């Protein structure tokens, strides 16, 4: 079964089993609602041997989520999971509108310019503010390129071919 990362359990909060979660999903209100089942994995790369938990309480504060899981009602029950990755099964993903993508669909794609010049590979996605930023790892030790996900820059995403076509704005490359 395939799992996809939606957060990281970064710390405990208080003594009643509440945990602090850094969110890496565009749908936190859906992923972290009461009754939702999640899987906890020791490392981000693990796909088997996860622990299934069910959310008993959830609240959002300053971009973080504070969760309590059913049956884990004190700090001793949850402390061992600090640093663990929170994932959902592939079946929990829903279809997105045209032009929208899950992170796992974008990371790893090759990037070429509109002049068909290879630029590199998307290695991660940042969400600093109004627009996501796609980080492109370049070949031969060149510095990474930060591409804002705006229509003026991202011209085409072809998931089948594994290629993103971009138009470089002045100043995007050193």
Curated annotation (Swiss-Prot):
Keywords: Chaperone, Cytoplasm, Ribosome biogenesis, rRNA processing
Subcellular location: Cytoplasm
InterPro entries reported in the protein's UniProt record: PRC-brl_dom (IPR027275), PRC_barrel-like_sf (IPR011033), RimM (IPR011961), RimM_N (IPR002676), RimM_N_sf (IPR036976), Transl_B-barrel_sf (IPR009000)
Biological process according to GO: ribosomal small subunit biogenesis; rRNA processing
GO terms of molecular function: ribosome binding
Domain (PRC barrel) ranges: 98-172
Keyword Cytoplasm applies: yes
Domain of life, source organism: Bacteria
Primary site of residence: cytoplasm
Pfam family of the protein (one): PRC
GO CC terms: cytoplasm; ribosome
Record SUPFAM superfamilies: PRC-barrel domain, Translation proteins
Subunit: Binds ribosomal protein uS19.
Comment, domains: The PRC barrel domain binds ribosomal protein uS19.
Function noted in UniProt: An accessory protein needed during the final step in the assembly of 30S ribosomal subunit, possibly for assembly of the head region. Essential for efficient processing of 16S rRNA. May be needed both before and after RbfA during the maturation of 16S rRNA. It has affinity for free ribosomal 30S subunits but not for 70S ribosomes.
Family membership: Belongs to the RimM family.
Name assigned to this protein: Ribosome maturation factor RimM
Taxonomic source organism: Lactiplantibacillus plantarum (strain ATCC BAA-793 / NCIMB 8826 / WCFS1)
């Amino acid at each position: 079964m395939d799992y996809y990362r939606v957060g990281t359990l970064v710390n405990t909060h208080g003594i009643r089993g509440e945990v602090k979660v850094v969110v890496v999903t565009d749908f936190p209100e859906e992923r972290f609602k009461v009754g939702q089942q999640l899987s906890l994995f020791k490392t981000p790369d693990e796909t088997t041997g996860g622990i299934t938990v069910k959310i008993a309480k959830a609240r959002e504060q300053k971009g973080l989520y504070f969760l309590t899981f059913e049956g884990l009602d004190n700090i001793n029950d949850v402390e061992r999971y600090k640093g663990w990755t929170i994932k959902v099964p592939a079946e929990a993903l829903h279809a997105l509108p045209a032009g929208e993508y899950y992170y796992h669909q974008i990371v790893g794609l090759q990037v070429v310019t509109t002049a068909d010049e290879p630029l590199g590979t998307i290695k991660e996605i940042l969400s600093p503010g109004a627009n996501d930023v796609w980080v492109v790892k370049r070949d031969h030790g060149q510095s990474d390129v930060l591409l804002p996900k705006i229509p003026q820059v991202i011209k085409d995403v072809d998931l089948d071919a594994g290629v993103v076509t971009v138009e470089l704005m002045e100043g995007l490359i050193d």
